[in-house]
Curated annotation (Swiss-Prot):
The gene is rpmE2. Keywords: Ribonucleoprotein, Ribosomal protein. Belongs to the bacterial ribosomal protein bL31 family. Type B subfamily. Pfam families: Ribosomal_L31. InterPro entries: Ribosomal_bL28/bL31-like_sf, Ribosomal_bL31, Ribosomal_bL31_B, Ribosomal_bL31_sf. HAMAP family: Ribosomal_bL31_2. It comes from Streptococcus thermophilus (strain ATCC BAA-250 / LMG 18311). One of its GO terms (cellular component) is ribonucleoprotein complex. PANTHER family: 50S RIBOSOMAL PROTEIN L31, CHLOROPLASTIC, LARGE RIBOSOMAL SUBUNIT PROTEIN BL31C. This is Large ribosomal subunit protein bL31B. GO terms for molecular function: structural constituent of ribosome.
Amino acid sequence: MKKDIHPDYRPVVFMDTTTGYQFLSGSTKHSNETVEFEGETYPLIRVEISSDSHPFYTGRQKFTQADGRVDRFNKKYGLK
């Protein structure tokens, strides 16, 4: 492998701006902000949505079902 061509992989704290939830993960993304997390100082990356606020993970997801042509026909003529 060539030296000095790979990005620096390091631990960073991701913060969900919607809920304030923070978690530690590895990343190559750089940030000028830092935060104290579990007694250590890490770079801070702000994200708009995470598993703490995404409807799929929180159980607040709504499923919509598009009616097909047959369903629309049956509704139109009062069948079924």
